[in-house]
């Protein structure tokens, strides 16, 4: 029989302090950015924001202050406002009448008029109910941006009575900004329904264009069936770039198809004639227009959702001006520590080439950014690796012209013309394991690669079109290719690379790694904002992204965390990609902490340590989930817990007998035993609780594994939720008993075995 003991005080803290959570959530911030050297007032829409008192913005040079929290009014509160408004209207009406004989005149004051305006604003908000509950609550913030603050995306979190919210993007820019008045969208026009079919076919007449001067960033929120327009003066010969940021601000919307604000841009002349339009840029959902102005005059930039949907969280920023824009680079990467000459394509650029070294930087992905005068370009990714590098030659589009390469190598090339292919010859021996990996789409290239490996006689050995990289959470079309195969015999082999859609052009660059396996791993931990009560325990999802066939166990540990945090079940089992572990909070209250999770594994006899990247598990269009990387893993401990509490959890995995039952003994303080029940939280298929029996100094738990379910060797963690069922009201005996959550216990490692369970 396996036994585990927990200190009584800690068990009390875990069960008593933790209740069913209402997780604070933010859905949008508007405006979603500001100019450095200025201050901006923003609205943050979300849910469970009660007690919002502090805002956290990543990076230096920005400071946010919560100025007000606005919760939607209840029906009774709204009626009270209506009654007060009626009294004031009656008073105003009476003040205009001649008073009756002997009666004092009714005086309607300036203060009364001001109060009516305040009431009208509040009642307007009541009549325009928020589209959905998840963005119904509002926090008002004042953000100061230093003049020397770095340009780029920051992450904004609110600290509420329920803890930290998820992060959301707030952009720091360098251009003048204009923001439209915030909007409210009625529920009938929510993002799922969008505009009516009639409005989609012929949207209502848009409001008059807003007059702006270039260069500028304009901020707005899209409403259903409408288009926002901006009029500006431009000079003939200017290359004006119009770039929308919408999906970049809010990557995924869970309750919409498509699963984001799909912005569409149109450029018109003064008479309304369409000059250019776009609803994407290559595979990027956010559109970009570059247009050479034909003559001096007035022009109109217009934005709308592609199917005329709209809601408060359909937030956009449009950058307009004769500004530097990088559209592609070549090569897409280089060797770490070596200088690389990079050719750059785009508009309004100061140079066509740059010489970069990224001296001292380890392998990874870094942005290439240019400045022209006072303005900064967009950033494009550039990859550094430690392997030897070469460039694909011209004229290797046929097998007999294949370029011979020696492993290991990274080939930098491009499919320069539609229908073109590139062939590479490698020599190997029987049993050699090789990896061929294309990195293109993950570096901003539109290439949709295909890899095919054949032997000298033309027989296909391996083929791959797309492979899914869980680390590329912002890509919905994973278009890069990966082959891992073992060569059947000694000889020459030919690797063909082409575009699956037979497209090509100078922007269709790629990096092709050809090598023996380089086993490695990455980690993601979610959510990126974690809230738990003092002394309580909560589950955490850890995802292992295994590279080049690495299948070993990964030991997990906390870094930069106070020693009284406890990580339980701290390992990703060999051969598995996911595990749920638990984190137990200390007893003391603390400010939000930025901590780290690390993973350690033995690879080819060497210890390798990787730091987990915090991520949000975002839902797209009701169905798809993506791990989107965030800047920090923030933990908030709430409330007071027992002092000096500690856990003593299982030191070895519980061995569960397949097709049988395994007893597990948990020590629980007597005062928690009465009526306490346990339930498995998202257990593996086939593992269940057979019985829970109170005993003098704990709980006797019997776990069962179905005979046809889990295979021997399966490892992981079991997470138990404790609860009580409250007796139903005697006056409403037909109603079922209510489950009262008590908390979550630290993870119990397990292993499924054949035969008798371990003792």
Protein language model features and the residues they cover:
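Acidic, Ser/Thr/Pro-rich low-complexity intrinsically disordered segments
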Residues: 21-95, 105-106, 211-375, 384, ...
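C-terminal segments of large proteins
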Residues: 15, 571-574, 588, 654, ...
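Hydrophobic h-region of N-terminal signal peptides that target proteins for export
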Residues: 9-18
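Short proline/glycine- and polar residue-rich coil/turn motifs
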Residues: 131-135, 281-283, 293, 475-477, ...
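Ser/Thr/Pro-rich low-complexity tracts
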Residues: 18-213, 217-222, 304-310, 314-315, ...
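C-terminal luminal/periplasmic domains and tails of membrane-associated envelope-modifying transferases
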Residues: 532-534, 646, 654-660
């Amino acid at each position: 029989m396996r036994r585990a003991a927990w200190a009584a005080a800690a068990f009390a803290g875990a069960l008593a302090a933790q209740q069913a959570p209402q997780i604070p959530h933010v859905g949008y911030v508007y405006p979603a950015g500001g100019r450095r050297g200025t201050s901006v007032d923003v609205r943050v829409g979300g849910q469970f924001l009660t007690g919002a008192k502090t805002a956290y913005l990543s990076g230096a040079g920005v400071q946010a202050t919560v100025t007000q929290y606005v919760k939607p009014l209840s029906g009774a509160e709204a009626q009270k406002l209506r009654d007060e408004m009626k009294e004031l209207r009656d008073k105003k009406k009476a003040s205009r009448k001649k008073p009756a004989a002997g009666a004092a005149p009714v005086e309607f004051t300036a203060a009364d008029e001001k109060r009516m305006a305040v009431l009208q604003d509040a009642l307007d908000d009541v009549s325009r109910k928020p589209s959905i509950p998840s963005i119904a609550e509002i926090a008002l913030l004042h953000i100061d941006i230093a003049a020397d603050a770095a340009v780029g995306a920051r992450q904004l979190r609110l600290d509420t009575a329920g803890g930290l919210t998820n992060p959301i993007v707030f952009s720091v820019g360098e251009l003048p900004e204009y923001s439209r008045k915030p909007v409210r969208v009625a529920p009938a026009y929510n993002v799922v329904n969008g505009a009516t079919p009639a409005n989609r076919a012929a949207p209502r007449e848009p409001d008059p264009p807003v007059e702006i001067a270039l260069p500028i960033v304009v901020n707005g929120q899209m409403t259903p069936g409408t288009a926002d327009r901006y009029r500006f003066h431009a000079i003939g010969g200017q290359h004006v770039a119009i770039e929308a940021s919408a999906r970049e601000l809010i990557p995924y919307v869970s309750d919409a198809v498509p699963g984001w604000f799909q912005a569409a841009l149109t450029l018109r002349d003064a008479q309304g004639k369409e000059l250019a339009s776009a609803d994407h840029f290559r595979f990027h959902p956010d559109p970009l227009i570059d247009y050479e102005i034909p003559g001096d005059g007035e022009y109109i930039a217009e934005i709308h959702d592609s199917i005329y949907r709209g809601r408060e969280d359909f937030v956009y920023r449009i950058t307009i001006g004769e500004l530097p824009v990088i559209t592609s680079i070549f090569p897409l990467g280089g060797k770490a520590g070596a200088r690389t000459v990079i050719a750059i394509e785009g508009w309004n650029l100061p140079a066509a080439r740059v010489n970069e070294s990224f001296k001292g930087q380890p392998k990874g992905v870094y942005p290439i950014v240019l400045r022209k005068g006072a303005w900064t370009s967009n950033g494009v990714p550039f990859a550094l690796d430690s392997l030897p590098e070469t460039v694909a030659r011209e004229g290797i589009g046929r097998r007999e012209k294949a370029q011979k390469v020696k492993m290991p190598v990274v080939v930098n090339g491009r499919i320069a013309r539609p229908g073109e292919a590139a062939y590479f010859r490698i020599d190997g021996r029987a049993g050699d394991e090789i990896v061929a990996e294309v990195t293109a789409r993950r570096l901003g290239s539109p290439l949709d690669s295909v890899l095919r490996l054949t032997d000298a006689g033309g027989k296909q050995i391996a083929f791959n079109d797309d492979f899914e990289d869980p680390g590329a959470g912002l890509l919905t079309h994973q278009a890069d290719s990966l082959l891992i195969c073992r060569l059947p015999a000694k000889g020459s082999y030919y690797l063909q690379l082409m575009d699956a859609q037979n497209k090509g052009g100078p922007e269709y660059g790629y990096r092709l790694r050809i090598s023996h396996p380089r086993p490695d791993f990455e980690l993601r931990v979610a959510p990126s904002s974690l809230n738990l009560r003092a002394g309580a325990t909560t589950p955490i999802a850890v995802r292992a992204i295994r590279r080049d066939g690495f299948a070993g166990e990964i030991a997990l540990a906390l870094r930069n965390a106070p020693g009284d945090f406890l990580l339980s079940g701290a390992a990703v089992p060999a051969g598995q990609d996911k595990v749920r572990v638990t984190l137990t909070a200390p007893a003391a209250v603390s400010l939000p902490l930025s901590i780290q999770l690390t993973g350690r594994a033995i690879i080819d006899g060497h210890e390798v340590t990787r730091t987990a990247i915090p991520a949000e598990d975002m839902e797209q269009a009701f169905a798809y989930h993506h791990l989107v990387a965030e800047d920090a893993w923030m933990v908030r401990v709430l409330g007071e817990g027992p002092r000096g509490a500690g856990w003593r959890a299982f030191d070895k995995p519980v061995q569960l007998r397949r097709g049988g039952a395994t007893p597990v003994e948990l020590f629980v303080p007597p005062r928690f035993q009465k009526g306490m029940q346990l339930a498995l939280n998202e257990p593996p298929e086939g593992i269940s609780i057979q019985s829970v029996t109170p005993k003098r100094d704990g709980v006797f738990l019997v776990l069962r594994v179905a005979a046809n379910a889990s295979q021997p060797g399966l490892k992981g963690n079991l997470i138990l939720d404790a609860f009580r069922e409250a007796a139903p009201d005697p006056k409403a005996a037909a109603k079922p008993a209510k489950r009262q959550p008590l908390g979550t216990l630290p993870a119990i490692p397990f292993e499924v075995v054949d035969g008798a369970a371990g003792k």
